[in-house]
UniProtKB/Swiss-Prot annotation:
Keywords: Cell membrane, Disulfide bond, G-protein coupled receptor, Glycoprotein, Membrane, Receptor, Transducer, Transmembrane, Transmembrane helix. It comes from Homo sapiens (Human). It holds the Pfam family 7tm_1. GO terms for biological process: cellular response to hormone stimulus; G protein-coupled receptor signaling pathway; phospholipase C-activating G protein-coupled receptor signaling pathway; positive regulation of arachidonate secretion; positive regulation of cytosolic calcium ion concentration; positive regulation of inositol phosphate biosynthetic process; positive regulation of MAPK cascade; positive regulation of vasoconstriction. Receptor for arginine vasopressin. The activity of this receptor is mediated by G proteins which activate a phosphatidyl-inositol-calcium second messenger system. Residues 1-35, 94-108, 174-201, 304-321 are extracellular. Residues 1-22, 398-417 are annotated as: Disordered. GO terms for molecular function: protein kinase C binding; vasopressin receptor activity. The gene is AVPR1B. This is Vasopressin V1b receptor. It is a multi-pass membrane protein.
Length: 424
């Protein structure tokens, strides 16, 4: 399979879309470049498949204890696994055989699934970011376990991906590379000279430009909300004389002074939990990885169809190969980002190494109410009694738990109070 875009149209070297002005179809390829690509694709396939399967198996063991964030991570891992199996694997096999080996129906199905996995992965990331936006900026709407709105957010990316990928079925077919040559390959026929430019521009907007714009807007609002929350905490600290004196809640005058003039969604929940901020950081890193991996791919593709002077020789082919491989790397990055933020998702051997290499956890003292006190983390852990939940409370600078963050508040802060030893 060629290493160019998933909607290749012109019979150029390696079948890329980078040479709309090419006049002579090529029947050969750069074998050395193909060998390098095959090796890289095989590595990407192993890493993406292994990493995402590890995440799926770990989350699958939680059963009904899965939180909202668990569901989004699970489905994002599914979309990345789809990229590995429906995009990377066919591309690897196609590079090995050079020409497409299969009937016309298989040609159309492969092209459809390749773009579907790209749409699904992008839109699932967007849905997860929207969920984090709602959790931070509209917390009262998210004080619940996975509900109808959550499942709608998860189903929408799959549905949109299935619809937006349909043009692939009609554009691609098994056709002769050169009329009368008898050499067949899975190529596109747009019907109009402007077809490749229009289709590629629309796909770039739908998969990259518009989603990145929405992701940027969401994170701008999230950062703004967190800054306002920090302002509330700072004002409360100053009004309270530099710290909370007892386990009791701050006085009504303190709360009134610190929340006056702020939106109700900020004053209704006095703090954004550390676990929630951690999930925001994780999603933000995933977004950065997505942009870093796919920006070169779409930049080169747009350059090839909009610049008549774009190179159409070997240099362009190398650039297309590198850009396409960078896009595939995104499916490798995501599962390791999950595991980096959540050590419990690591496979057991890696988890053991992480435990041996890291600092030993502090001893926790059991409080009279059965909760656990720790100075560093806010974790929900399940005790030996199935019906009992013990909560580790983070302490303030004065060494005492935050009075306004009761165990119940922390459980409900992200709508994920039944999770087991997790940060989301």
């Amino acid at each position: 399979m060629d290493s160019g875009p998933l909607w290749d149209a012109n019979p150029t070297p390696r079948g890329t879309l980078s040479a709309p002005n090419a006049t002579t179809p090529w029947l050969g390829r750069d074998e050395e470049l193909a060998k390098v690509e095959i090796g890289v694709l095989a590595t990407v396939l192993v890493l993406a498949t292994g990493g995402n399967l590890a995440v799926l198996l770990t989350l699958g063991q939680l059963g009904r204890k899965r939180s909202r964030m668990h569901l989004f991570v699970l489905h994002l891992a599914l979309t990345d696994l789809a990229v590995a199996l429906f995009q990377v694997l066919p591309q690897l096999l196609w590079d090995i055989t050079y020409r497409f080996q299969g009937p016309d129906l298989l040609c159309r199905a492969v092209k459809y699934l390749q773009v579907l996995s790209m749409f699904a992965s992008t839109y699932m990331l967007l849905a997860m970011t929207l969920d984090r936006y709602l959790a931070v900026c509209h917390p009262l709407r998210s004080l619940q376990q996975p509900g109808q709105s959550t499942y709608l957010l998860i189903a929408a990316p799959w549905l949109l991906a299935a619809i937006f990928s349909l043009p692939q079925v009609f554009i691609f077919s098994l056709r002769e590379v050169i009329q009368g040559s008898g050499v067949l390959d899975c190529w596109a026929d747009f019907g109009f000279p402007w077809g490749p430019r229009a289709y590629l521009t629309w796909t770039t907007l739908a998969i990259f430009v518009l989603p990145v714009t929405m992701l940027t807007a969401c994170y701008s609002l999230i950062c703004h909300e967190i800054c306002k929350n920090l302002k509330v905490k700072t004002q409360a600290w100053r009004v309270g004389g530099g710290g909370w004196r007892t386990w009791d809640r701050p006085s009504p005058s303190t709360l009134a002074a610190t929340t006056r003039g702020l939106p109700s969604r900020v004053s209704s929940i006095n703090t954004i939990s550390r676990a929630k901020i951690r999930t925001v950081k994780m999603t933000f890193v995933i977004v950065l990885a997505y942009i870093a991996c796919w920006a070169p791919f779409f930049s080169v593709q747009m350059w090839s169809v909009w610049d008549k002077n774009a190179p159409d020789e070997d240099s362009t082919n190398v650039a297309f190969t590198i850009s396409m491989l960078l896009g595939n790397l995104n499916s490798c990055c995501n599962p390791w980002i999950y595991m980096g933020f959540n050590s419990h998702l690591l496979p057991r051997p890696l988890r053991h190494l992480a435990c041996c290499g890291g600092p030993q956890p502090r001893m926790r003292r059991r409080l009279s109410d059965g909760s656990l006190s720790s100075r560093h983390t806010t974790l929900l852990t399940r005790s030996s009694c199935p019906a009992t939940l013990s909560l580790s409370l983070s302490l303030t600078l004065s060494g005492r738990p935050r009075p306004e963050e009761s165990p119940r508040d922390l459980e409900l802060a992200d709508g994920e109070g039944t999770a087991e030893t997790i940060i989301f």
